[in-house]
Amino acid sequence: MRVLPATLLVGAATAATPAQQVLGGLQDFGNAVQDAMHENLPKINKPLEAFQEQLKSLYEAREFWEEVANAFPQNLDHNPVFSLPKKHTRRPDSHWDHIVRGADVQSVWVTGENGEKEREIEGKLEAYDLRIKKTDPSSLGIDPDVKQYTGYLDDNENDKHLFYWFFESRNDPKNDPVVLWLNGGPGCSSLTGLFMELGPSSIDENIKPVYNPYAWNSNASVIFLDQPVNVGYSYSGSTVSDTVAAGKDVYALLTLFFKQFPEYAEQDFHIAGESYAGHYIPVFTSEILSHQKRNINLKSVLIGNGLTDGLTQYEYYRPMACGEGGYPAVLDESSCRSMDNALGRCQSMIESCYNSESAWVCVPASIYCNNALLAPYQRTGQNVYDVRGKCEDESNLCYKGMGYVSEYLNKPEVRAAVGAEVDGYDSCNFDINRNFLFHGDWMKPYHRLVPGILEQIPVLIYAGDADFICNWLGNKAWTEALEWPGHKEFAAAPMEDLKIVDNEHTGKKIGQIKTHGNFTFMRLYGGGHMVPMDQPEASLEFFNRWLGGEWF
């Protein structure tokens, strides 16, 4: 059905005009009409202006879709993906050592400063439960001297069940901070971060755990969370297709965990993650900070090689692919020119997405920009996560090690030891990835939340300088472009050498750093998309120093 704009505008104006009243004479009637029109004109114009903006956005969206359909028809062969629920068997309550009921937490009332009754902890937690089991490390051979907990956060109202794995600090758990780790995707399990990057063990080609001396739980307790639902060991009868929907789940998990373990709640708490966590972390952090009455002692956030501000970051795919990021060019001159030519249109689409935040605009922006600026690199067969080498295993995001992790976590004895309720494990769920893309989440301007976060806590953006897909050039650029009170000083701050200071390699240059106020950017030499995997010593160095408060 097609409706002309003029018809709609006239109809709206007519509907907004007040009903006529019976007056004493024609002159009075005319004056009354003029007065009524004058009085109500702003009321008429405001919805008309809003409606005109909506029409403009719709026309623009139609143009975008037609352009994308003509240029990349293969990318529109998509229907919303409603994944079949994972096969699972819920364990009886008797299996778990603790079950923390959100309703019980919400039932605790205290007397506030004004003398009125208020909830001890804010948030809508009634539908949530947290199941907790102390895991026997000796049965897995993973950090056998470290206390571990596994379990599920249950959203009983929406049939969502998020799996987590907690490792206590190897050092001083009574005083060391607590960190939540999130992998990206969207749709990839944080257990890949555990076993490929920063956890207490890696998995070798024999599918056996190998001790990691550079694990991030060397001086911090770490929680690895499989989110959103239907990722890793998590499962649900429903689906999640945008970042905001997952924020309340994370707040509930942390609140109930710290309620059960107040000894950890007393410690400093930090959120860290990589890749699409550049979307997750600003949203999750804002959700936590929005609650004044909370038991989460949030002190800072860390985002590694993240996607946070697409408008700025997509500009740096061409430079990184064409030899301007510190490594040899991957693409030839013709491909580089093609990317240059496509950039302007890509950015105009992203700007429209930022203005409307509508899926109708944001989806074609993602499709166009990814095909124009990412696909030329992907077609070379080079690893998008590391410009220094080829993609060695396309079925496992270029890394054979990811296949080892999946094989290990699919072992029945491993699933039994950690209390997993699903019948199988996949490192990444690509249905979720597509759903996030086709709901417009990929290009949304979540970087706009960062200034509000900086008002309250420090933020570290770090980037391995060999990554292509979330490269250091783009991450440095968006941090320097971000509008916040310290913008000018941060942008003008020089990049200084980052050196090891506390081991036998003292003085070794591991990267560059710039900082002002609560904002810090780091470039890590020789790190790809997964810095802790590529540069374990350097990553533990900056991680420990960041948690120690050296730069804030």
Curated annotation (Swiss-Prot):
Maturation-removed propeptide residues: 18-133
UniProt superkingdom: Eukaryota
Any one Gene Ontology molecular-function term assigned to this protein's record: serine-type carboxypeptidase activity
Key words, A-Z: Carboxypeptidase, Disulfide bond, Glycoprotein, Hydrolase, Protease, Signal, Vacuole, Zymogen
Pfam families: Carbpep_Y_N (PF05388), Peptidase_S10 (PF00450)
EC number per UniProt: 3.4.16.5
Annotated GO CC locations: extracellular region; fungal-type vacuole; fungal-type vacuole lumen
Phenotype caused by lack of the gene: Decreases strongly intracellular carboxypeptidase activity.
Record localization: Vacuole
The reaction(s) this protein catalyses: Release of a C-terminal amino acid with broad specificity
Entry's Gene Ontology BP terms: proteolysis
Active site: S275, D467, H529
Main location: other
Glycosylated residues in this chain: N219, N518
Signal sequence residues: 1-17
Cysteine disulfide links: C188-C428, C322-C336, C346-C369, C353-C362, C391-C398
Enzyme class: hydrolase
UniProt record similarity statement: Belongs to the peptidase S10 family.
Entry function: Vacuolar carboxypeptidase involved in degradation of small peptides. Digests preferentially peptides containing an aliphatic or hydrophobic residue in P1' position, as well as methionine, leucine or phenylalanine in P1 position of ester substrate.
Protein known as: Carboxypeptidase Y homolog A
Organism classification: Eukaryota, Fungi, Dikarya, Ascomycota, Pezizomycotina
Protein's gene: cpyA
